Amino acid sequence: MITVQNYVNGTFVSTKETIEDINPATGEIIANIPRSKSDDVEKAVLAADNAREYWSSLSLDDRRVWLEKIANALEARSEEIATLESLDTGKPIKLARAVDASRSIANFRFFAEFSKDYNKERFEMDDATNHVIFKPVGIAGLITPWNLPLYLLSWKIAPAIVMGNTVVAKPSELTPLTANLLAEVIHEVGLPAGVVNIVHGLGYEAGQTIVSHPKVNLISFTGGTITGKKVAETAAPMFKKLSLELGGKNSTIVLDDVKMDDAIPEIARSGFLNQGQVCLCGSRVLISHKIWDEFTEKFVNYVDNMKVGDPSSDNSDLGALVSFAHRDKVESYIHLAEREGGEILCGGKRPSLESPFDKGAFLKPT
């Protein structure tokens, strides 16, 4: 079992209640994570508030150095990041290496570099010089999803802290392992206590407490549209700064002059990357009627030959869906399509896999 704890005020702490973290590829329990309640979040907000004055008083150059330290420490553990991400999400490890690990590291480096030119702006006028000076907002409440756990957590934390804000972050309870690794890295490099606080738990408990807390000045949420609406309804009357990245429904348009042999692998990748669990993925293909038959035959054949299986194998194109509940939801939409007259040309069923993956949340690309 992997140990996962909250990271508050520079210390790893447990909670009274826990949540099981399940490996979706095998159904095995891999960790028991904190189920943070309002008092646990309150401690994290207090720590962030206490650290705010000192952290914001540092120069951009000083804060930038900390981002570079974090990036270097993450890079030293890049293979561990990929392994944990694959274990937690069910995605193929080759994808976790190429995207999750590499881009999480790159996020800290990018925002360290970006901040060099993001301090002051000066506008000369005939009789005056106007200056725009950027100041920290305060405490940033950051809530991230399960599909790209560390990638999106680092995408939020890095710009928040380099600009002088302190952070209370809540990763998805489905995929907490790399957030815990990030806390270990932050502790290892010696980032001042309270600058980054990470609490685990459920959205309607820990997440809602972060969003509604009067001392949290900014909310950045990535997740479902329905939840995003609730976040906005809570944050807007409090005049919090609010950033929402929500669901997508994307079309791929295929015209007559398409080079099919080049396009089909890319269209399949855009639709099934990360088992299709990315808001940027193409969820439907609109095809010119002139090439419908030829394109459909080739595309279905390509998708039908994509390999579903062991996420730790470099031979697997697709791994497991993130949870059994999510697989059930996807299957319900497939059944709905059939009831409404749709024809399943490939996939739509659970693959036959050897133990222990026969107990996992796998589904053929459909």
Can you describe what each PLM-predicted range is?
Residues 84-92, 122-128, 313-319:
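Short linear capping/connector segments at secondary-structure termini
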Residues 30-118:
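Glycine-rich loop-to-alpha-helix module at the N-terminal edge of alpha/beta enzyme cores
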Residues 52, 56, 71-78, 82, ...:
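Structural signal for hydrophobic packing residues in well-ordered secondary-structure cores
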Residues 218, 226-364:
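ALDH superfamily catalytic-core signature
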Residues 120-262:
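Rossmann-like NAD(P) dinucleotide-binding subdomain of oxidoreductase/dehydrogenase enzymes
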Residues 39, 76, 80, 91, ...:
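Short alpha-helical
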Residues 10, 27, 63, 85, ...:
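Residue-level signal for inorganic ion chemistry
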Residues 1-32, 65, 69, 118-143, ...:
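Terminal low-complexity tails and localization/encapsulation signals of metabolic enzymes
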